[in-house]
Regions:
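Electropositive, gly/pro-rich neighborhoods at or near active sites that engage anionic ligands
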Residues: 43-201
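Anaerobic metallocofactor- and corrinoid-dependent redox/one-carbon enzyme cores
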Residues: 2-32, 36, 41-44, 178-531
Length: 531
């Protein structure tokens, strides 16, 4: 392979235009980027073949979902595993259309797609197709998490094929725009499915205070989003004097009754994903990555990094489908942890954070919230959440939350909350002013809260004293944004930059129809939103 690539799917892409050199800002090489394109090409070919005479099955959807999830930012940096996936996709297509490869007519009906056609398409077509592609990549992560718990939705699965098929067709804006909005619709179903999977498996989250101090002795840090992997790790470390600490998007796990019942699930280590290379440098413990966001490990801690599921990095120890975490546990015992309790703080100096304010908790006190809004005790609600990242300017979200008036409430979710989740904003009406709803997929909970409040007031969500101030980084943020647009939610503030893959005409459509606006200065945006 040559050393040129093209990728503009994440917020940190070079110059807000695209990564085109020997490596992306995320750390993936040009060869990995081109293999991800090849995998996507093969997945479009597989989607085309799902209309064949041979019926698709659960394995078809499982492979399609895994392939899409593998191409999400900061998931896989491993050429070998991506090549293996490409071979599996081709084998599955051959099963669905066994006579296609030997057919003499060469109609091209089930061929893999040439991704260069997408990257070089007319800019508005490229923009809409990119929204579809990146949206279903993000949605695939949620479908994958639900799938490992035994939950699936046929309509969601079939939409993956429909969306991929659309990307491969020579369609214009009129045909593509409805598919873009359908990504939002199907992602809502997918998030509802994952919410059901998590809550039926682990109980409904309840508020909990999570310490940031790491106790002395051996421990393991688990990062990512997969609660199933955490559950298995907790079971395998029971009675072994090895404590478990969450990291990044795993923090909300502490709110689930079936997870927090384990006494050795002790607390949370570190902050958001982009700080891992600094925070893990001298960590006397192994780190297990269950999903994104993995950054290329530094030599100072590379021997302590373990991956599982779709996460993969060359020469890192990978835990296979049997989920036998013995090597991770042995590494924890070998390293021994800290000799004394080690206090840590969040970005703003707090020594504990709270989580677990899912829809059941907030709606359980909805009468108090409604009365407080009616009486004027609560003037406004903000949803400030989304992905964190390394680009300068993300301190906007810290300053925005700090400046919210005392008669307002801040709901948050996803790893963007680490910018401010250790702040003490006090209480209002007996409730914390700052409430962590959960992981990025728990946007479903936030949506249910907003819809329930709108119903209680007899108005639409857009008529509530509610503003959404969102940060984005990767593809799960794309599918969540499309879900909000599908629901007709308007006047969202988005930052720290607008996506490079959104063309001026598509952006103009979003501005005119949904009132999307970039963030500016915290004090200016607050002034506008509180009008």
């Amino acid at each position: 392979m040559d050393n040129k690539m093209f990728c503009f799917q994440c917020e940190q892409t070079v110059g807000c235009t695209g990564c085109t050199g020997k490596a992306g800002v995320c750390g993936k090489t040009a060869d990995v980027a081109k293999l991800q394109d090849e995998l996507t090409s093969a997945l479009i070919g597989l989607a085309r073949a799902t209309d064949g005479d041979t019926p698709v099955n659960a394995d078809t959807w499982r492979l399609m979902i895994k392939g899409l999830f593998t191409t999400v930012t900061n998931v896989s940096f491993n050429e070998k595993t991506i090549r293996e996936l490409i071979d599996r996709v081709h084998a599955e297509k051959e099963r669905l259309v066994p006579n296609c490869s030997s057919c003499g007519s060469r109609c091209g009906r089930n061929d893999d797609y040439d991704m260069n056609l997408l990257w070089n398409a007319q800019e508005d077509v490229r923009s809409l197709k990119s929204l579809i592609l990146f949206g279903v990549r993000g949605m695939a992560a949620y479908a994958h998490h639900a799938m490992v718990l035994g939950y699936a939705d046929e309509a969601v699965n079939r939409f993956f094929a429909k969306a991929l098929f659309a990307i491969g067709e020579d369609w214009g804006m009129d045909e593509l725009l409805p598919i873009v909005m359908e990504v939002g619709e199907k992602n809502l179903k997918c998030m509802a499915l994952l919410d059901k999977a998590n809550t039926e498996s682990y109980g409904m989250p309840t508020p909990v205070t999570v310490p940031l101090t790491v106790e002395k002795g051996p421990f393991i840090v688990i990062s990512g989003h997969d609660l199933h992997d955490l559950k298995l790790l907790l079971e395998q470390t029971k009675g072994k004097d090895v404590n478990i600490y969450t990291h990044g998007e795993m923090l909300p796990a502490h709110g689930y009754p079936e997870l927090k019942k384990y006494s050795h699930l002790k607390g949370n280590f570190g902050t958001a994903w982009q700080n891992q290379q600094k925070e893990f440098a001298e960590l006397p413990a192994p780190v297990l990555f269950t999903t994104n966001c993995l950054m290329p490990p530094k030599a100072s801690y590379a021997d302590r990094v373990f991956t599982t599921a779709v996460v993969s990095y060359p020469e890192m120890m990978h835990i296979g489908e049997d989920r036998d975490f013995t090597p991770v546990i042995e590494k924890a015992l070998e390293l021994g942890g800290y000799s004394e309790d080690k206090p840590f703080t969040g970005i703003n100096g707090g020594n504990a954070v709270m989580t677990g304010f899912a829809r059941s908790t907030v709606l359980g006190v909805a009468d108090r919230v409604i009365e407080a809004v009616k009486s004027g005790a609560i003037r406004h609600l903000f949803l400030v959440g989304g992905c964190d990242g390394a680009r300068p300017g993300r301190n906007y979200y810290t300053e925005f939350v700090k400046q919210t008036p005392a008669d307002t409430v801040v709901l948050t979710l996803a790893c963007g909350k680490y910018r401010f989740n250790d702040l003490d904003l006090g209480t209002i009406g007996g409730l914390p002013r700052l409430m962590d709803v959960g992981q990025c997929n728990d946007a479903y909970s936030a949506i249910q809260i907003a819809v329930a409040l709108a119903d209680a007031f007899g108005c639409g969500v857009n008529d509530l004293p509610l503003s959404m101030v969102l940060s984005w980084y990767e593809q799960k943020a794309v599918c969540i944004l499309l879900t909000l647009l599908y629901l007709g939610i308007k006047n969202i503030r988005l930052g720290p930059t607008l996506p490079a893959f959104v063309s001026p005409n598509v952006l103009n459509y979003l501005v005119e129809n949904f009132g999307i606006a970039p963030i500016t200065m915290p004090e200016e945006d607050l002034k506008q939103l509180l009008k």
